[in-house]
Each structure stands twice: as C-alpha cells, then as structure tokens.
From Swiss-Prot:
Its EC number is 3.1.3.77. The keyword Repeat does not apply. GO terms for molecular function: 2,3-diketo-5-methylthiopentyl-1-phosphate enolase activity; 2-hydroxy-3-keto-5-methylthiopentenyl-1-phosphate phosphatase activity; acireductone synthase activity; magnesium ion binding. Belongs to the HAD-like hydrolase superfamily. MasA/MtnC family. Its cofactor is Mg(2+). The lineage of its organism: Bacteria, Pseudomonadati, Pseudomonadota, Alphaproteobacteria, Acetobacterales. Pathway: Amino-acid biosynthesis; L-methionine biosynthesis via salvage pathway; L-methionine from S-methyl-5-thio-alpha-D-ribose 1-phosphate: step 3/6; Amino-acid biosynthesis; L-methionine biosynthesis via salvage pathway; L-methionine from S-methyl-5-thio-alpha-D-ribose 1-phosphate: step 4/6. The gene is mtnC. Bifunctional enzyme that catalyzes the enolization of 2,3-diketo-5-methylthiopentyl-1-phosphate (DK-MTP-1-P) into the intermediate 2-hydroxy-3-keto-5-methylthiopentenyl-1-phosphate (HK-MTPenyl-1-P), which is then dephosphorylated to form the acireductone 1,2-dihydroxy-3-keto-5-methylthiopentene (DHK-MTPene). Binds 1 Mg(2+) ion per subunit. This is Enolase-phosphatase E1. One of its GO terms (biological process) is L-methionine salvage from methylthioadenosine. It is an enzyme of class 3 (hydrolase). Keywords: Amino-acid biosynthesis, Hydrolase, Magnesium, Metal-binding, Methionine biosynthesis. InterPro entries: Enolase-ppase_E1 (IPR023943), HAD-like_sf (IPR036412), HAD-SF_hydro_IA (IPR006439), HAD_sf (IPR023214).
C-alpha cells in the first residue's frame, strides 16, 4: 500500500460479480443447451476442432457426455470454455442473458477510468466470456473501460509467473499494479511477483478473509484504502 497503483487488475467471480451468477445462471444455461449447440454447429471448423480436442481427452466418448463431465468438475479446459462462450454469446445477443455485477462496481470502475487509472481483467473464464459478461450489464457496456482481458492463456492464476507476465505485457512495474481477488492463493501468487494485492470479501459469496493481505468489502473501500478516485 506504499505505492499508488497505476493499473488495477481485477478478478471477476467473487470480486466484481457474484459467484452465484456464474454457477447458478451461466453454467446451467450452457449445460441445458450443449447437446443442441453441438448438433447445430458441430460441422463449423472452430467447433469441430474443439470436438476433436474432446476426443483426445476422452477417446470414443460422446462429446456432449465429455462436456458434461468436464462441467461437473468445473474443469478449465479450452474446448469447454469455447463452447460455453459461444452458447452464452447467443444468449446475450438474444437478450436471454444479462450479467449481474455488484452495485458498487460500475460507478467505481467508471470513476477510476475517468481519472486515467488503467484497468484490466484476469479471470479463469475465457477472454470472450469476460467481454460478454462486461458488455451486457444492467449498467450498460463496460468493456471500453478495460485495456486488456487476460485469461489462463497467460498461465495459472496461482502462478506468480502469470502476474509478472501480465505486468510486462502492460509495460508497468509490478509495484505499480494492484490486483483485486477474493481468492487468497491468487493474491499470494501476485504478491510473490511484487504486485500489490487486496482481497475483496463479499458477504454474499461467503468469502473468508485472509489475515495475510489487506481486505475490502467492495471497490469503494479499495478506492479509499489505495488513494484512488471513488464515485462520491
């Protein structure tokens, strides 16, 4: 907390969006439409390539069966994320889905962006899914506020090297980056890379506060603690 951050890197689930939205809305929506989507789009090159990857994961198994098994394990694998993302894209485009963010999020993000503070996302969800979620909120589209959307192609979120790589790609010293997440192991990895961290502790998500890092109940509290603008 000794260096004023120039870049805020944000997690999504449990940080700016309720975990329940992903697990109780997005996942069931995709699950119910997997079979129909694969049947309708399986011949498209992108989807055919994803199905081939699934066959390598579970040789000979029906692709929908493999997708469902991966969803049951909350597996972070490319073919599943791609197909989920395509299904969600259709849902958002049709108006069947609207993302849910915590009410403090949009005003604070707009205040930060308006002050010149740089913003980026780092989530286990695909870049495409991140853009969908932030592009279809009750507060309007928020994607233009962010310079970059990082996913696990940068590496695992519990690997310090991932955070160092993000700082390099954004051309900012790690000490000038602030990472916000609800997950202590992710904060530990970022801190190891020399990045400032703050744990977002949302009561709705049942987050357990860590004794090792600064904590905040929402983004407005982060703004106060790290001397950044708030919307007040």
């Amino acid at each position: 907390m000794t260096t004023r951050p120039e870049l805020v890197l944000l997690d999504i689930e449990g940080t700016i969006a309720p975990i329940s939205f992903v697990h109780d809305v997005l996942f069931p929506y995709a699950r119910a439409r997997l079979a129909g989507f694969v049947a309708a789009h399986g011949d498209e090159p992108e989807i055919a390539a994803a199905l081939a990857e699934l066959d390598a994961i579970a040789p000979g198994a029906p692709p929908v069966e493999t997708l469902l098994a991966l969803m049951d394990r909350d597996a972070k694998v490319g073919p599943l994320k791609l197909i989920q993302g395509r299904i969600w894209a259709e849902g958002f485009a049709e108006g069947a889905l609207t993302s849910r963010l915590y009410p403090d999020v949009a005003p604070v993000l707009r205040a930060w962006h308006g002050s010149g503070l740089r913003l980026a996302i780092y989530s286990s969800g695909s870049e495409e899914a991140q853009r969908l979620l932030l592009g279809h909120t009750p507060d309007g589209g928020l994607t233009a506020l962010f310079e970059r959307f990082f996913d696990t192609r940068m590496g695992g979120k519990r690997d310090a090297a991932s955070y160092a790589a993000i700082a390099r790609s954004m051309a900012v010293a790690p000490a000038h980056v602030l990472f916000l997440s609800d997950v202590a192991d992710e904060l530990a990895a970022a801190a190891t890379a020399g990045i400032q961290v703050c744990q977002i502790v949302r009561p709705e998500d049942g987050t357990i506060a860590s004794a090792d890092y600064p904590t905040a109940p929402d983004l407005a509290a982060v703004a106060a603690a790290f001397d950044r603008p708030d919307p007040a």
